[in-house]
Amino acid sequence: MNIYKPAGFWIRLGAALLDYIIVSVPLLLIYWLITGKDPNDSMFISLVVLLYSILLPMFWRGYLIGKRICGIRIVKKDGSQVSLLTMFLRVIVAGLVYCITFGLGLIASLILIAVREDKRTLHDLIAGTYVTYATPGEEELNADEEIRKSE
């Protein structure tokens, strides 16, 4: 496994905040304007954000809007594009782990990203992914270069 250009904590946090501002806040506001109900109690909003988090990276080469703006993306640990199963593991299963551990899993992720050279968090380890600065196709070029160097 060759982790190429891993993205650290601050850039990932920035991307998550951008996603919240660009995706969640408008959804919450629209929901509130249309229904007049508290959007924090809405399963609809949760479902839309969940589908966004799982499906968009599959169709947009590992990018979510915030990650795209920050120039980072999610890839499998071999550098290939994420799949439905990968994103399911990353979002749903890891989310359950974070809930079941009452946030201790999140603390573990913060420690992992700080101490691991590859910057992989708990949800990355569960899903077999990492977050990289590499653009689509760049990992393949790097892998080819590594092969040539070893010959």
Curated annotation (Swiss-Prot):
It is a multi-pass membrane protein. One of its GO terms (cellular component) is plasma membrane. It comes from the Bacteria. Keywords: Cell membrane, Membrane, Transmembrane, Transmembrane helix. The chain crosses the membrane at residues 14-34, 45-65, 91-111. Disulfide bonds: none annotated. InterPro entries: Pra-immunoreactive, RDD. It is found in: Cell membrane. This is Uncharacterized protein YckC. The gene is yckC.
